[in-house]
Amino acid sequence: RDLVRSRGLGDVYKRQAVERTKAYKYQSLAAGFVGRKADPFLVTVHPKPEDEPMYLNSHPGQEYNMVLKGRLLLQINNKDLILEEGDSIYFNSELPHGMKALDGEKVSFLAVIL
């Protein structure tokens, strides 16, 4: 779906693809919102070969992730965590972190970067 609807306001916004890294597909959920305090994204992680190294990233601030579909291997500061549908995590995004889709299936998650 390319549209986001605010039920209370009736406004419709087009999701905007954003390239934060080539490792994952990001869609901004607040593109065009002036003065926002957070950056919400719908993120898709496609499965990769088992032997492919995980891409690690770090950026200022904090990050909240909630898995919407699939199973995700999340590495934060050399610690591995497995998140399943409905699981969420809030962490210091200045620490090196990366994600990998598990079970040969793509993963979708909500990411909010503060």
Predicted regions mapped to residue ranges:
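Histidine-centered active-site/metal-ligand motif
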Residues: 2, 59, 97
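Single conserved hydrophobic/aromatic residue that forms the stacking wall/gate
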Residues: 2-13
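Conserved short histidine dyad/triad with adjacent acidic residue
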Residues: 14-16, 22-32, 41-59, 93-94
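Ligand-binding loop in jelly-roll beta-barrel domains
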Residues: 24, 36, 84-85, 93-114
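Short acidic-glycine-tyrosine-enriched beta hairpin
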Residues: 29, 77-92
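Solvent-exposed residues in well-ordered beta-strands and their adjoining turns
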Residues: 44-48, 77, 112-114
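Short, conserved beta-strand element in jelly-roll/cupin
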Residues: 58-74
